[in-house]
């Protein structure tokens, strides 16, 4: 597989940004390019939670899933890609279990905001065909905006995309919401990461809920304390490669069941096709 491969079933990417090692660890971009890529893969393969038994291709398909036959877009960065889980994330587990087709537009280290290259906004406009038919559009609330201290911005009184400052978190989210509503006309779902030590990301989560009131999108809130409280410290250490990125086991046994339950509800309530 190349660093960035995209087709109807899967797409993935890695960042080419120049970052310090500390930033790389947080952003999930370590090993994304050059010789570091092989080192990253070897390091991830040694993690118990990434053992072959947890691979997505060993996941059994469910019968009569509400998501079966759906077409779902996933937009995100390293957590959506699966940077610490050998390129497999909740996307592959959900698709394998539920029998839907998908596009995964995920590039490690990228931000929602256009303040940095290869942003969510830019890739949504340039890489996702506006004529494609999607039943759901799922977008990650990126931790990279928090790590890079992208300005939060303010909620606009306007619904016109030209009025949104996409160099801010708020403007980027509003732009995505407006764009999805115009071109794909399907339910939009944002998902957060599980709780870690970041006041800035906590502010982004709060902002996301405020924007929900304006735009009416759905939120799968993994940041909620109850999600972290649902696993023991021992399980957490097994499920998470670092405070941001799950292992294969973390996606399969922790994140996927939560996301699946919420996507079932959303599909049953809002998907007409």
Model region roles, listed by residue range:
Residues 1-75, 79-86, 96, 129-135, ...:
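N-terminal secretory targeting modules
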Residues 71-73, 79-160:
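Conserved SGNH/GDSL esterase-like catalytic core that processes O-acyl groups on lipids
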Residues 86, 115-120, 165-172, 200-204, ...:
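Soluble or luminal CAZymes and related metallo-dependent hydrolases
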Residues 140-144, 174-208:
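Active-site segments of SGNH/GDSL-like serine hydrolases
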Residues 153-161, 233-240:
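Short glycine/proline- and charge-enriched loop/turn segments
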Residues 158-169, 241-246:
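A short acidic, glycine-rich active-site loop
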Residues 193-273:
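Catalytic His-Asp segment of secreted/periplasmic serine-dependent ester chemistry enzymes
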